[in-house]
Amino acid sequence: MDFVNFVMALSPILVVLVGILGFKQSAKRVSPIALVWTLILAFTYFNVTGASFADNVKTLDPLVWKGIKEGLKIVLMVFGAFTILNLLRETGAIDDVKSTIARISDDRRVQLIVIGMMLPIFLEGAAGAGAPAAIAAPFLVALGFDPVTSIAVALLGDATPASWGGAGLTTINGGAALVDAGLSTVSLNAAMVGRFHMFGVLIIPFIMVGMVFGKKGFKGAVPYLCFAGVSTCVVMFFLSNFVGAEVTSMGTGLISMLLSLAYVKLVGVRTPEEFRHHAAAQQRKYSAFRAMSPYIYMLVLLPLVRYGFPAVVPNGFAVMCTFGYIFWVDVVILVCGMLGAATLGVSAKQYRAVCSRTVGNVLPVLITMGSLLIVSCIMQSPTTGMMNLLASDIAAVVGRFYPAAAVLIGSSGAFITGTGLGSNIMFAQMHIDAAASLGMNPITIFAGQNAGASLGNLICPNNTVAACATVDAIGRENEVMKHTLRAFAIVLALYMVLAMLYTCVLFPNYGM
């Protein structure tokens, strides 16, 4: 391992982290600096082939445009989600949303777990592509939670199901290298990563409550939190090990929400007054359905389009992904916003005014997202080899602790790419080679990579910026990342221990 090369490859990440967390600057200011620095490295230090300036421009130009195009798609999703929140505020339906949820449970901690953890798990399976945080964070804000902690909770809620993604794509496509090599199957890959995340969802309810309410938040809520964690854990284990990757995330989220609400109704939660949600004592303007209609439409249309369109249209999934996977999710969210506006009785003029105001709020996000995604594309590019250098150097140093390192490598890949799928595809072959040279099980090692990649979404700057934009918290990314980094460290340590136990002690011959 060449330490200088390692630090130089790591430096774009350090610029982002030090700028946001160390100097407490907004991502909007830090990301262009990181982009300029990464471009300088690509033209000089990591110009390993000695290409001329003109040739380098030709190589990097497609990467720059790719980053801008992907940034536009994410901003479109942010626009759709933020428009819905602004519609609810404009019409006053937001107060009726609060009172509707309060009628199910007036305990803010129950609301936090159901909307912050279980709903994102469902949405990840229904759509993925950033939809969970983009929908759950505004929903929590609508219920009266602080925007910063709402974002952190929504991102944490999506830290486990991203290993399956929309219809299991992250595991199915991400683990294709193992399947093609005859080392594993989709079922084995899905089952083993489920054995990581079942412990993640077991502790996440406690992390969420501690993050939002502190130690006092556990008063009277421990039995419910135990039930929420254990029930989600059991459902996730069963679906991932005995049903399949395609339904694990959506099924876990839906069943867990139903079980949680049944517990609240049948057993109840002891709610101190300070954690009781007090609905405004005023006459309802809208029925529960009308007030929550944009979110109800999303819960129905996202899975309906994802599973229904490919079922009835030849090559339907390919058609959906003509402009990239995330684009169909953008369109569905925009349509749900329009349907919600019609259901709420919003005039065309009023709807246009809300959209115009929202455009002004989210447009600056394009600079941030575009810059960070261009950095990501350049670091992933074989031309610079920066990401592969980081991963291979980590692998070379750790030796027999490679299973734990695989979790860290997976997280690093997702931190850069913004997706677990991108991280899995990037590093799967490297893990196969490392497992062969070390005489270890490639299935458990890849499961650690897959689990780490899902967890890495929690701290990815791209995801943080996008989520901040949905609740008008642009510029507060450093506050969000302080919360998410602490949660990330706890779950990362757990997964690294599990990776060592599974590979070296419990399942050394799993699937072999």
Where are the model-predicted features located?
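Alpha-helical transmembrane segments of multi-pass membrane proteins
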Residues: 109-121, 147-163, 185-205, 400-415, ...
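Hydrophobic mid-bilayer segments of alpha-helices in multi-pass membrane transport proteins
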Residues: 8-17, 25-50, 75-81, 225, ...
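Hydrophobic alpha-helical transmembrane segments of multi-pass integral membrane proteins
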Residues: 107-138, 142, 159, 366-382, ...
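Membrane-interfacial loop-to-helix junctions in multi-pass transporters
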Residues: 69-74, 101-115, 143-149, 326-329, ...
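Structural signature of hydrophobic alpha-helical transmembrane segments
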Residues: 1-11, 71-74, 129-132, 187-203, ...
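Interfacial loop-to-helix junctions that mark the boundaries of transmembrane helices
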Residues: 1-6, 24-30, 60-72, 187-195, ...
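Core transmembrane alpha-helical segments of multi-pass membrane transporters/permeases
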Residues: 58-95, 114-121, 287-308, 321-385, ...
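Juxtamembrane and boundary regions of transmembrane helices in multi-pass small-molecule transporters
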Residues: 24, 163-277, 451-512
